[in-house]
Amino acid sequence: MMDALLKAGYRPEIERAVQQCLASQDLADHETGAVTAEAAAEHGSATAVEDGKRFRLFELSANCIDLNDRQVEVLLAMRQPNVVLFGNLLCDWECDALIESSRPKLTPSRVVNADKGTYELKRDVRTSSGAFFQRGETPLVAAIESRLSRLLGVAESRGEPLQILHYPPGAEYRPHYDFFDPARPGNQRVLSMGGQRVGTLIIYLNDVKAGGSTVFPKIGLDILPKKGCGLFFSYADDAGGLDYQTLHGGSPVVAGEKWIATKWLRLGDYLARSD
């Protein structure tokens, strides 16, 4: 596994984080901290999190996935939480084109207010800027969304708009969960747009000089940004409950800047509301 990471261009420093993560795997299997399917059902989320089992890509036996337009490498796969690191997901010019096309559209990033269901600025939590591309908005976006659909086996209609995020020096995203707590009243609005989120794919669009890793603090794993690579994780544990080990964040950029593309997947077809 480490040979594959090094071949893909990852620095040797990542070995320590990966080995620490793997060493703690047995403990994590027994002490997940995740809610059970029965507990999730009390809030109407059992069906949503059970769907996450479909994304357990660690079951793939191949180290390389043929998507017709390119060969995508599997560099790292974890069972619980379900985390997969892909190499060669995007080529350099695709990464560069996404960055340049997003620049005129960038606005300060917002977070969902779980009590009101509104999107609000919260600079003490998230200090990036971002831009959204609707499904098929450009030929490049359409080609990338088609590739991601083939990779994950998920219909394009279940994906939220592709989001491009820019993190200048010092910018970060504090640890958080991507799924919505159905017990919070404001989340009913966002859940009505396609159901629960079941998976996240982060694509690194540039190499970062220092900092800017994707960190999973509960399992001691840092993924360092590498241009063209993609990080996928889903939120269901083996029992079909929400896996709280998927707590993650974007560590502060120390030097240089960080660009990523994010695709969130829903239980059903995603349809944004206009109100």
What function would you assign to each model-found segment?
Residues 3-232, 236-275:
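Fe(II)/2-oxoglutarate oxygenase catalytic core
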